[in-house]
Amino acid sequence: MKQFIDFIPLLLFFIVYKLDPRTVDVAGHELTVGGIYSATAMLIISSLVVYGALFIKQRKLEKSQWLTLIACLVFGSLTLAFHSETFLKWKAPVVNWLFALAFIGSHFIGDRLLIKRIMGHALTLPDPVWTRLNIAWIAFFLFCGAANLFVAFTFQSIWVDFKVFGSLGMTVLFLVGQGIYLSRHLHDADTTTPKTED
């Protein structure tokens, strides 16, 4: 459910971007709908609404949600202010690389790896497995950032499609792979845990 909520602003961004540009009258002001700049405005507004509603309901946002919201506001505002989509193209790479940096930092700062802090309440795994998982997430975020950057500046006609659905596809594939990897280790943990007598 959380992943779907986080996806709402990006989906609205995609829908508005794909509209044929047209001029509409809103309270006496002419606004252009369709294309990158109105889509960017929609991304900013919908992000504020979605995360604002989450904050009101939960009384907090996760750190990853704060980072996503701040990046959206910063890069989106720069895109609109300078009328240049270059800023927005850097948003996904920067956010992904900051996530990678956080996972890297947890190897040196704190008493637990970041992936263990996130998933440790639900899973019991050996420390070497947690280490491999953390490294896998680092590699994933670094790759996603590089892929987004490459597509954004190389394939102008499809970068928005990739930003929305390519990133989602990579995430789904990675999570499936992680699930397969974890299922093997969880099975091993079950078979090595002594069973109690009824």
UniProtKB/Swiss-Prot annotation:
GO terms for cellular component: plasma membrane. It holds the Pfam family IspA. The keyword Transmembrane helix applies. It is a multi-pass membrane protein. InterPro entries: YciB. The chain crosses the membrane at residues 36-56, 67-87, 90-110, 135-155, 162-182. It is found in: Cell inner membrane. It comes from the Bacteria. Keywords: Cell inner membrane, Cell membrane, Membrane, Transmembrane, Transmembrane helix. Plays a role in cell envelope biogenesis, maintenance of cell envelope integrity and membrane homeostasis. Belongs to the YciB family. NCBIfam families: ispZ, PRK00259.1-3, PRK00259.1-5. This is Inner membrane-spanning protein YciB. It comes from Pseudomonas fluorescens (strain Pf0-1). The gene is yciB.
